[in-house]
A protein has these predicted regions:
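Feature marking well-ordered beta-strand scaffolds used for ligand recognition
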Residues: 1-176
Length: 176
């Protein structure tokens, strides 16, 4: 199956950007797809019959990124809006809900999200010289709480490196 940008309501001046996968508890597969105006949820269980389930509007932006934890998706953009929290609990029934936006004392611009699904921490980077921001999504996934910040300099990307040995030079269970 082939979906075009106009299928997502994106005009010729718009774009598609990042994507991420989600598998529902029933085993159905979904693509979370960023467009210049929204985060789309597309069922791809049968790739020959992909269908748009929902679109969550966001600020117009060249870049949008998304990640998941439990049955929640988190979406950000370089256009602002903080972290959009999207509930996918009923996605198989075609119900996708924007729970809210997480705003803190930073601008809402973000380039990249990384989620460590083992520790339950979300890392937000690449936004207007705001450094790297850390959020707890384990305690209350619907309302991530900022628990840390590293630097006020620009950080473009992040990755999670879990440590599995006590002989590590680091005194933390993970690094970014």
């Amino acid at each position: 199956s082939w979906l075009t940008l106009p299928d997502f309501g994106v005009n010729a001046a718009g774009n598609g950007n990042s994507c991420f996968g989600y598998t529902s508890p029933s085993g159905r597969e979904y693509a979370l797809f960023g467009t210049s105006t929204s985060t789309a949820v597309v069922e791809v269980t049968n790739p020959g019959d992909a269908r748009i389930v929902a679109q969550i509007p966001g600020p117009v932006s060249l870049w949008r990124d998304m990640r998941t934890y439990s049955h929640y998706a988190y979406a950000v953009s370089e256009g602002g809006s903080g972290i959009q929290v999207i509930d996918l609990a009923n996605v198989d029934a075609g119900v996708v809900t924007l729970v809210g936006n997480v705003h803190d004392d930073f601008f809402g611009q973000t380039h990249t999200l990384v989620v460590d699904t083992q520790s339950g921490y979300l890392y937000r980077s690449g936004g207007a010289g705001q450094g790297l921001r850390m959020y707890d999504v384990h305690t209350n996934p619907a309302q991530p709480a900022r628990v840390g910040t590293w630097s006020d300099r620009y950080v473009h990307e992040a990755t999670i490196v879990p440590f599995t040995t006590e002989r590590s030079l680091w005194h933390t269970p993970e690094a970014w």
